Amino acid sequence: MTAIPITRSSIAPERQQLIRQSVRSAAAIMTEADNSRLAQADDAHIFHAFLSDPDIHAPIYTLPRPLNVDAVRAFIADHLAQRERGEGLLFLNFDASGAISGYVDIVIWPQWAAGELGGAVGKARQGQRRGIEGARRGFDWMFDVLGLDLICETAALDNIRTAKLLDGLGFRRRGEILSEREDGTTRPSLVWEVTRSEWDAYHRR
């Protein structure tokens, strides 16, 4: 059983179905400027090329290992199946030239009206306010479009950039867990959470 979210508040089956349907209906995620769409099987080569930069893939424990085109294709197929169940989404973001500028990997726990947003942005966007603004828009979208009550995030203990981002966006630190990769290896991770009401108050929505 997953170690996250830490906070688990069960919701009515009818509301769970509404969340699942919102996930199944999602075709793009709100971004600051880039175009977004669902990842498809024929994106495997370009997505693999984007992920091949160690600075992008190394910190992300949810990516397949070894990281090759076939593994990326299977990763996309798994997320399309998750979407059909109403439990996950994988979006690719594209810049004005049509190149991948980032991706968004969303896990949904409909039974708790909770979710986790992961992914990465290309080097051109790293270290800029655009990355922070993009994360904020993504969290807004999860609350507003998917109808979630809670967002839970994790990061490696030495991932200072993500820690600063989450702290600065109003998330609460909830402790440490042992995250497990698909290949069975593990890493310690810090955990943050924020409820919809906390998010709305912090960002004056």
Task: Put a short name on every predicted segment.
Residues D78-L92:
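A short helix-loop-beta-strand connector motif used in the catalytic cores of GNAT acetyltransferases and
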Residues I56, R65, R85-G88, I151:
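Secondary-structure boundary/capping residues
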